[in-house]
């Protein structure tokens, strides 16, 4: 079907209605994930997804997202415009159906969109239902059509407000303050997602503007190189093993597949997968196909060209894990009827996709390596080093496994364990130093709180191979205490081999990093975060990792004692106390370390579940998180300096 024919067919008849909208306001989390920061930002993504669907169909070249001074958000595109003619079944304009009926839209009609994204296809009506007000303006059929809504309800009939030579859709909405915990959109979070979408849709221009403040930020994203540019962006602070990006692209079949990958001298891998522009953070059948193809193609090339050079008395075979060391890869597939596992679309379940991706990627990588033999040789040499490191790590892992409590042996000697054995109720505090560890052991709730003091330096996981990492005493203690096992090779379906990491064996469902509030404490905290992100990311993904927030100051007046967690809180506290009682001196103590607090104070301020503040560690964007750790903990000194200078003012709320 030609673009002209398809454009003519996109009318009210294309809008399919599946169900009503009543439940959205009662249970918003079912539709947008939660009512916190993540759910709020999903409102923007849902509207933008409509514009991206137009781009996928070949009718949209530019999308503009604007944060307005009043707190609302506007999304403007130059697509065909949502149909405005009457819907036969609903007896109302099609645009009103799209805005007021759940699961209504062109994405459910195969003639309008071959593929589309969106949060399980719930559509922009969910945004309407969760907004105090919203208006939509459509340029189509020679006119500008507008309709206004409040809490999802139309306030007037669709009316023509002017003439239009061009086409497009503009949606402006203000989130409902009675539903969301905060309606303050974060520029950086939206910018990262829009950048991602621009990479995934080469040639599409996406503009973001912040008009909430004078001279606010502004970005324009447009990447003609697509995924190849995306890989270079993710890899910019790594030392590349080869400059040329390996690309595989096939748009001719029923399932378009687009892959870009490159190796660096790093020891970590960073593989991002997308289905219809949706980041499938849990992978799925497309990732399984990619992994299988990569391993087979590399081994085939190595064998064919006699590149596996074993040392004397050495038995060596290269696994998928070896070929993933230092790999940065992006996999994007377009699936007409994707089957996602989970409400938030994080794992692809279509069985047929694995074979399709496997075949295309296998053939594509083999062709590339045959045309670029020097790159193939470098990759195989790196994989051989990884295999030898893996062999050494296996011995270290066996030692840890023998020490594991679940293997029937003892826990680390310095661990003060809790008496409860139900992981749901148990907490493990990773505490900096023996002094603070001693106070924590005395002040804790022995029933549910375990303490593991960290005496030596935790190794930097960003710059250490697996065998060196596992020889570090502190890392060994952490792994043994957690009880999950560690690492190991995953098979080509993404499942780990028996005896290696198993999240089901985690002994504590709260792992709390508790360090001093000084530079050394921050460094140790960052090293631990790097370790968990790079080597035990399932713990972060499961929501098990937290940061303790100890106070910086103790403010006292007579027998009254208060704790302040930052300078601003301290100043307000002292000012109030001086006003209330001018005759009694206000005392101030700054805590340089956790060890300066006695067990009672440490319990009251940092460990008591009733009064403490914990920060849950989450990953909003895998690409951004990988880049953050790479900048902070990698070998590029200049990149680290630039990152720190840029983000120094945010350190109180640094979100990794």
Predicted feature residues:
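GHKL-family ATPase ATP-binding module
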Residues: 1-14, 21, 43-45, 53-55, ...
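Conserved helix-loop functional segments at active or binding sites
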Residues: 23-26, 30, 53, 57, ...
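Conserved ATPase-coupling elements of RecA-like P-loop NTPase cores
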Residues: 57-59, 84-87, 521-524
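C-terminal interaction appendages of subunits in large macromolecular complexes
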Residues: 388-407, 422-427, 438, 442-444, ...
């Amino acid at each position: 079907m030609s673009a002209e024919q398809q454009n003519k067919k996109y009318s009210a008849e294309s809008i399919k209605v599946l169900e009503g909208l009543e439940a959205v306001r009662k249970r918003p989390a079912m539709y947008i994930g939660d009512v916190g920061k993540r759910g709020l930002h999903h409102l923007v993504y849902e509207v933008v997804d409509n514009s991206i669907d137009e781009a996928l169909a070949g009718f949209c070249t530019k999308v503009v997202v604007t944060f307005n001074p009043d707190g609302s958000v506007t999304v403007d595109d130059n697509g065909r415009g949502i149909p405005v003619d009457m819907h036969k079944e609903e007896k109302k304009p099609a645009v009103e159906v799209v805005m007021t009926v759940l699961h209504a839209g062109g994405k459910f009609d195969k003639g309008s969109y071959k593929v589309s994204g969106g949060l399980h296809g719930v559509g922009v009506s969910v945004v309407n239902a969760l907004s105090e007000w919203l208006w939509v303006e459509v340029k189509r059929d020679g006119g500008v059509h507008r309709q206004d809504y409040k809490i999802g309800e139309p306030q007037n009939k669709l009316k023509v407000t002017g003439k239009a030579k061009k086409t497009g859709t503009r949606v402006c909405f203000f989130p409902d303050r009675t539903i969301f915990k905060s309606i303050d959109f974060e520029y950086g979070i939206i910018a990262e997602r829009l950048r991602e979408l621009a990479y995934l849709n080469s040639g599409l221009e996406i503009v973001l503007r912040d008009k909430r403040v004078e001279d606010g930020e502004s970005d324009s994203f447009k990447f003609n190189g697509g995924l190849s540019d995306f890989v270079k962006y993710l890899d910019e602070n790594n030392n590349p093993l080869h400059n040329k990006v390996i690309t595989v692209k096939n748009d001719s079949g029923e399932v378009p597949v687009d892959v870009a990958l490159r190796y660096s001298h790093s020891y970590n891998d960073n593989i991002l997968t997308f289905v219809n522009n949706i980041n499938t953070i849990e992978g799925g059948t497309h990732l399984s196909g990619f992994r299988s193809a990569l391993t087979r193609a590399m081994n085939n090339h190595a064998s064919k060209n006699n590149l596996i050079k074993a040392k004397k008395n050495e038995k060596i075979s290269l696994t998928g894990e070896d070929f993933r060391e230092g790999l940065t890869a992006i996999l994007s597939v377009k699936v007409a009827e994707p089957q996602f596992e989970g409400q938030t679309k994080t794992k692809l379940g279509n069985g047929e996709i694995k074979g399709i991706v496997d075949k295309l990627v296998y053939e594509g990588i083999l062709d590339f390596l045959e045309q670029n033999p020097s790159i193939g040789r470098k990759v195989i040499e790196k994989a051989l080093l990884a295999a030898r490191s893996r062999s050494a790590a296996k011995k270290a892992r066996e030692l840890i496994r023998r020490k594991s409590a679940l293997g029937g042996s003892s826990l680390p000697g310095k661990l003060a364990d809790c008496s409860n054995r139900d992981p749901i109720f148990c907490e493990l505090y990773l505490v900096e130093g023996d002094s603070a560890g001693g106070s924590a052991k005395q002040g804790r709730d022995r029933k549910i709180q375990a303490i593991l003091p960290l005496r030596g330096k935790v190794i930097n996981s960003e710059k250490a191979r697996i065998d060196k990492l596992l020889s570090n005493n502190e890392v060994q203690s952490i792994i043994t205490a957690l009880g999950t096992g560690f690492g190991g090779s995953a098979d080509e379906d993404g499942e780990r081999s028996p005896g290696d990491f198993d999240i089901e064996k985690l002994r504590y469902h709260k792992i709390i990093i508790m360090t001093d509030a000084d530079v050394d404490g921050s460094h140790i905290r960052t090293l631990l975060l790097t370790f968990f992100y790079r080597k035990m990311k399932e713990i972060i993904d499961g929501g098990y990792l937290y940061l303790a927030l100890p106070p910086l100051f103790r403010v006292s007046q007579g027998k009254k004692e208060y704790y302040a967690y930052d300078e601003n809180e301290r100043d307000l506290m002292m000012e109030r106390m001086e006003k209330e009682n001018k005759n009694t001196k206000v005392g101030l103590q700054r805590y340089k370390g956790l060890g300066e607090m006695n067990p009672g104070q440490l319990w009251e301020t940092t460990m008591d579940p009733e009064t403490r503040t914990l920060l849950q560690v989450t990953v909003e964007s895998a690409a951004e998180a990988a880049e953050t750790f790479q900048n902070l903990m990698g070998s590029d000194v200049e990149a680290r300096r630039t990152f720190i200078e840029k983000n120094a003012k945010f350190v109180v709320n640094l979100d990794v």
